[in-house]
Amino acid sequence: LSHVLIIDSDAVVFTPDYLSTYWEMRHVADVVCGSIQSPTVCPYGCELRYKYEEAARNVRQMVYREAHPYAHLSTFNILFHRDVFDQTQFDERCTEYGYEDALMGLMLEKLGLTVEHIDNPLIHDGMDPNAVYLQKVETALRTLHHLGEPMHSASPLVRLVRRIKRWHITPLCRLAYRLTRPLLYRQLMSHNPSMTCLKCYKLGFYLMLDKK
């Protein structure tokens, strides 16, 4: 067995040449990363996850992924050389949802292993209901808080939290979150959730974790 192909349980193969594309590209790098495509129609009640995935489309463009091969690695759809997979594995600290992909990217970069991004998509068919997805977001933030370095330095959210601390406005931001959390929650549970509200919710939630 020379290679290990990882496909997420929520992924759907929809192109006839999916496997042959990976086979032809298997020697171009230590790790070959395919792409993710959202469903064409948003399932009712799953607008939050759907809009998040749509907003993430820009960083999933091939030109961006090629420019940042480690930062936007995704194990949703990925081919490892067997020796590389045995050498890296997944971080054992990630026992819950979130950040295993980011940590894998950091590990591959640290080891000097090569990553090639290709246009070989799978459809992400696991659109969670709004409340379920927000619970996953909270779990991922707890995971991030627990991980420490080097993940913290690589996280835009943690870097923002550090700036807030330097500006000495952390108590004010926590108060704003406590006051607006019910409104943010209702907005995120609506059929037209705002990604700006999601960012504010994540920042406030993380600041409260940091308080503990």
Placement of each model-derived feature along the sequence:
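Short beta-strand-to-loop acidic/aromatic patch adjacent to the donor-nucleotide binding site
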Residues: 2-12
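Glycine/small-residue-rich pyrophosphate-binding loop that anchors the diphosphate of NDP-sugar donors
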Residues: 69-78, 100
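Active-site donor/metal-binding and catalytic loop motifs
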Residues: 111-136, 140-148
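Conserved donor NDP-sugar-binding/catalytic core segment of glycosyltransferases
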Residues: 12-47
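Short, flexible, basic/aromatic active-site loop/helix in glycosyltransferases
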Residues: 51-70
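Non-catalytic, C-terminal membrane-associated alpha-helical segments of glycosyltransferases
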Residues: 139, 156-212
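Conserved nucleotide-sugar donor-binding
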Residues: 74-88
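Acidic donor-binding loop at a coil-to-helix junction in glycosyltransferase catalytic cores
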Residues: 96-104
